[in-house]
Amino acid sequence: MPLTYLKKQYRARQTRWTPTGDQFAFADSVDFLNHEHWDLASAGSGPLFGRAYLACLEAHKPAQLSFKYALVYRQGQPVACLVMQVLDSDLSVFLPRNSPLAHGGRLLSTRIFICGSLLCWGNRGVAVRQGIKPETVWPSVAEAIYRVRRSARLSGETDFVLVRDLPSAHPDSAILEDYSYSTVDVEADMVLNLRDWKSYDDYLGSLQSKYRKAAKDVLKNISKAGCVVEELADFESYEQRLFELYRLVLERIF
């Protein structure tokens, strides 16, 4: 057993320090990369790898978040693309706001490098071109992440690296274990079954009692304050204000 383990570790070390032979293009914005090549690499991977979506995300990102992108080339042809994020924050984001430790956490800065997205679930970090075997690309993914991290040292050290979210049954990504990555279990995606609700009371009736009581208490407090809850019919007139409130919630998360 010890000999088998040592052989495995030696092989993994050799893999980590051996270039893949693929070529790379890196950028701080998706618009800086070759548009045609990005579209070829991301075709079939869904709209969240689309340039229009990513450009919109860049324009309206949280203040502490920055983006990195990479195209992987093999023999001059694009075979994969990567979407990466860098979060510069402090340790208070991992604590409840009313925690006595939150203030101390603000004094400790942290940098998290993510291949994927903190703003949604699923694999939003790696798209492999159709017709390319994914298992041949993951070593290049690890090399691309390493290169971007090395260049990012000019603005600070990275404390943690995430590649998210990959299902446990994803065999190809297991190759990343040879590059010192390990698996971390995360919570399952939330699935909300929409019921045949016709009114707000129908919605409240479907909640657990403690949540239903909390919602009713909020309505009672609004009524006591002399306020009136009305249906928003003219949505377009309040569209900007609603978006500002949404942004406020998003900024508080980070």
What are these regions (language model features)?
Residues M1-F254:
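N-acyltransferase acceptor-side catalytic subdomain
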